Amino acid sequence: MAISRAQLLKELLPGLNALFGMEYQRYGEEHKEIYETESSERSFEEETKLSGFGSAPVKGEGSAIAYDNAQEAWTARYNHETIALGFSLTEEAVEDNLYDTLSARYTKALARAMSYTKQVKAANVLNNGFDGTNYPGGDAKALFATDHPLVNGGTNSNTQSTAADLNETSLENAVIQLAGWTDERGLLIAAKPRKLIIPPALQFVATRLLETDLRVGTADNDINALRTNGAIPEGYAVNHFLTDTDAYFLTTDVPNGMKHFERTALTTSMDGDFDTGNVRYKARERYSFGWSDPLGMWGSPGA
């Protein structure tokens, strides 16, 4: 349906002092704090996790050397979505508007809508990250699970066994937990946290935990071990599209974790209808958000 003069009555008459409602600031590309972006030339992308070798055994004198097998563990798949939105203006609405260029105003609103949608979709991977039934990964588990299966029969956990709110103890335990992660054959992988990702409600807690020299909540003169050790070297980032006010997450240095594939970059176009004189504008892009290795992220839903 085209935007006509009926929707723009005040803009057809003199005496209007201001038009407002589309000048709000918008949050930036917050997904870049979480995801690695790659381009894609297919309708979907797949990434397969490989299993290497176990620890080497002792070879006895004169005995045969032991041989091990490598294999594929599982495959993660990214299905790109097409995101598109448009609007149409009648010829008369454009002609009779007394105040500004309608197309310029509403193309800005279109860009705002497309940007907002991308940030919501990016954050929803974390928002739904504890739901393995509806949002499983390549290993058939939720992004955050206590039992990511390994080829050797063991498991890795990238969440808490008992959910806890963000505090000094829970954050220190998360750092310790990462140090115990192994590969598919049980070899330690030296994983470390990089950045704390939080909703707006936890920004002041995060500042006290990561940016003070001394421990918080105590009269003792103890140092802030998280800060002194550089345990979370990139500090924290607020994501305004997280829906759980007490959930918090850590990005890690494990490669091939959280990924954003860009199939088609954002494009805009317009055309005119000869019969009606209406002008149509649209924006369109194709992308996907997801994860390959779940160890690229650690998360807690909070208590």
Question: Where in the sequence are the language-model features?
Answer:
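Solvent-exposed alpha-helices and their adjacent loops that cap or buttress functional pockets
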Residues: 79, 188-190
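Long, contiguous amphipathic alpha-helices that act as assembly "spine/axial" helices in icosahedral shell
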Residues: 76-132, 196, 281-283
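A generic local secondary-structure boundary/capping motif
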Residues: 75, 184-186
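Short low-complexity stretches enriched in small and charged residues
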Residues: 2-4, 37-46, 64-67, 89, ...
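Internal, conserved structured core segments that host functional sites
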Residues: 125-147
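N-terminal alpha-helical "arm" segments
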Residues: 1-27
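Sequence/fold signature of self-assembling virion shell proteins
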Residues: 2-10, 141-183, 190-195, 201-303
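Assembly/oligomerization interface modules of large self-assembling protein complexes
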Residues: 22-83
